[in-house]
């Protein structure tokens, strides 16, 4: 009795463990909407992180340039000990005694002292010592290099922020493309499942007809061939879904591929909703042609501004620089402590550099003019891109409406051919062709819907929305 109870407990425990490990992955699956996918990509994608690092580096560079407005303070210290004095000389005291004084000295000094005055004397100084100084230099005029350098650093920070926005737009676009590609493949898989169910029903009808002797076995073989084709399509779609999941997971920084995506499954209803809101949401307006709101245009403007500042910097490098300063110094070179303070002014005038500097200024002027013309040229291209994006939205929307009507027509055509075949007035090839047209209309509708969503995103980005 005890053994039987133990076996029952083991079986119950085994069932519980089986259910736990069977349903745990399903419950652990996360569901992502399109916005969540884009948010995850913006947070985890390497391109966006790299652009953010660029913004932070540009900010530090701007702060570094700001310090040039303030005095430059430096300190210097030196201690030395030489093997002999660095200042050495030999002097004869008699050479420094004037002739008028020599007569009186000869009369008053003994002969030994007079003889000593004629011997050379060696003098040695600065064998060891300590030197220290503290200097502060304030630039007064530097040819505008400090001011223009700070402006250029600010432009660099603005450029890095614009590049971050462009990186975010590109990442958002790619993530949404992957999302709708996965939606398209999943919807096609649903179509394959629906067609497979339809073919199974047709197979049952044909099998009954063949057994009754009112249909040929060839009809049954045609249905089986079409079923094999559907199985082949299912395998390709499964592989495609797996690859897109991997790409989406890597691009958005998701931990694994065991996730599902949430979207409006009723494509037909969404198309009708889009048709009603199209005129309200995506009508061409004045903002569409306002290129100044685009990051690409602003980036070109910053390029012109940077070229102009670089030209001014080249001019400033050939102008005189003026600075004032103050310092405090200490030394004990003469074996006694000595300290003193001082103020000074410096003027530096480039002379030979003017020759090469004049060519540098001309080169910067050419680069500035090139940036101006590039701005004009790319502005026209941005206008064309806006118009092309709007045309793409209109075209994809019309394609979507056509695909919607094609589904209705293909559905009715399939219904009629199925009734005709049952009545014996149509061939199996006509019925299978109607089934193929129905499947193609569903797939085209799925592709048109995904393309419409991508075109809307391109339009929003092309118009700076």
Located regions from the model:
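Bacterial Sec-dependent N-terminal signal peptides
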Residues: 1-35, 40-42, 452
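A glycine-/polar-enriched beta->alpha junction
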Residues: 39-49, 56-71, 122-126, 134-151, ...
